[in-house]
Amino acid sequence: MVHLKVVVLDSFHSFNQLAFNQHAFNKHAKTYHLFAHIQQQIAICLVQFLKQKHYAKVLDLGSGSGAVFNALERQNILIEDFIALDNSINMLKLHPTHSINIQKISLEHADFEEHVFCDYDLVVSSSSLQWARDLKSVLEKIAFFSKEAALAIHTDFSLHEVHEFLSTPSPLRDLKTLKSLIKNAFKNFQIELENKRFALYFNRKQDALNYLKKCGLLGGSTLSFKQKKHFFQNMAFEKLSYEVLLFSGIKRS
């Protein structure tokens, strides 16, 4: 049995994109949600930023198997129309389709960068936007079409142990860059920003490796068998760190 300890650090996830791809994500979709402890904790923190208890139309970008949905349920937030959008069809198959508090649930298989936006009362995204090729454009569209937005975006601190071990740079943006992009895109919003660090501690190195595998990491054709073997045999850490920038904003009237 794997014993995990989730710790939220006082200071202000992301995955290694080089070791994370849609093939691996789809391959491990059925077990991903069982190992997505950090993602769920981040979604819970994000939803606590919301200013209202009732929304007419909500869009969840990069919904995955439903971390934001579950967090909304936990907070008893009422929603008339909820759209869960994700580019992994297998993840969407795991997303809840029934709710006491949400009247209509729609699942949309699409890339959030190609999504045709319309007007939303709330756009939310947790642990997804860090993979945007053109984050500036996505943020500007969210700001234009939403009355309220709540976003959790991973920084380059996430999984730094893995990057340091493999001597690879993180593909993610740093905290300063993310803050600048958000402030520029949401100039017409009253905003709140907070960065949080999370940590997973494992009893054994094998548990840490299994976690990475089950989350779709180190999968696909990114690492060779030899590289994976070297990674496990020489991996010197039993802790994985994550950092997210939490943003919430309401459009000024």
Over which residues does each language-model region extend?
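A short SAM/SAH-binding and catalytic strip from SAM-dependent methyltransferases
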Residues: 122-134
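Class I SAM-dependent methyltransferase SAM/SAH-binding core
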Residues: 59-114
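Conserved class I S-adenosyl-L-methionine
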Residues: 2-52, 67, 71, 91
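Conserved acidic residues
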Residues: 56, 121, 147
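Conserved catalytic/acceptor-binding region of the Class I
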Residues: 147-203, 218-223
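Conserved Class I S-adenosyl-L-methionine
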Residues: 35-39, 65-67, 170-173, 192-253
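A short glycine-rich, Lys/Arg-flanked "PGG" loop and its adjoining helix->strand segment in the class I
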Residues: 136-149
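A short acidic, Gly/Pro-enriched loop at the edge of an enzyme's catalytic core
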Residues: 113-122
